[in-house]
Structure formats: structure tokens, C-alpha cells
């Protein structure tokens, strides 16, 4: 039987990661017992993937319009607006 080591994206721990149910789309969720963060490896919704927020901010800073950013990234225009609106808050 093959064993895959999954590390926490928040604290990088590998020994305290346990399975924590499934998402509504049926993807496996994981829980880190050290920092209590939950995550999943597969995403159904494109805007939930790690790095999406930073890509949206980078495209806005480089002069790409909101509609063009939404079309290129494959997310809705309201998602772009929400990310830009919340970019002043710490993430």
C-alpha cells in the first residue's frame, strides 16, 4: 500500500495531518492538529485555489482591466471585485 505524506500549507507540519470529512463536491478535506487549519487538495471552484488572490492583485497592478482579468482567470466579475475590495485587508 502506497503512503502519501501530506503537509499543512499553513504550518508545514506533516505528522499532525488527519482526514476531516469531504466537501460538498466529494473532495477529501484535511485538518492540521497543530494549527487547526482545514484545507483540501482539489478545488472545484477556480477562485478558491491558492494563489488566485495574488494573481488578481498582480494583474490589476499591471493595468489589466477587471473584465479581462475575469475572462483570463475563468472566474466571475464579482469575484474580481470582491478580491480587489478586500485587498486592503490582511490575508
Swiss-Prot record:
<dbReference type="InterPro" id="IPR003220">
    <property type="entry name" value="InsA_N_dom_Znf"/>
</dbReference>
<protein>
    <recommendedName>
        <fullName>Insertion element IS1 protein InsA</fullName>
    </recommendedName>
</protein>
<comment type="function">
    <text>Absolutely required for transposition of IS1.</text>
</comment>
<keyword id="KW-0814">Transposable element</keyword>
<keyword id="KW-0233">DNA recombination</keyword>
<dbReference type="Pfam" id="PF03811">
    <property type="entry name" value="Zn_ribbon_InsA"/>
</dbReference>
<dbReference type="Pfam" id="PF12759">
    <property type="entry name" value="HTH_Tnp_IS1"/>
</dbReference>
<dbReference type="InterPro" id="IPR051252">
    <property type="entry name" value="IS1_transposase_InsA"/>
</dbReference>
<comment type="similarity">
    <text>Belongs to the IS1 elements InsA family.</text>
</comment>
<keyword id="KW-0614">Plasmid</keyword>
<dbReference type="InterPro" id="IPR024431">
    <property type="entry name" value="InsA_HTH_dom"/>
</dbReference>
<keyword id="KW-0815">Transposition</keyword>
<dbReference type="GO" id="GO:0006313">
    <property type="term" value="P:DNA transposition"/>
</dbReference>
Amino acid at each position: 500500500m502506497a503512503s502519501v505524506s501530506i503537509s499543512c500549507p499553513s504550518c508545514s507540519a506533516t505528522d499532525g495531518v488527519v482526514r476531516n470529512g469531504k466537501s460538498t463536491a466529494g473532495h477529501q478535506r484535511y485538518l492540521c492538529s497543530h494549527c487547526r487549519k482545514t484545507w483540501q487538495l482539489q478545488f472545484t471552484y477556480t477562485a478558491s485555489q491558492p494563489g488566485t488572490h495574488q494573481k488578481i492583485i498582480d494583474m490589476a497592478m499591471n493595468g489589466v482591466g477587471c473584465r479581462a482579468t475575469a475572462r483570463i482567470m475563468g472566474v466571475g466579475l464579482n469575484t474580481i471585485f470582491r478580491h480587489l475590495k478586500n485587498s486592503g485587508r490582511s490575508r
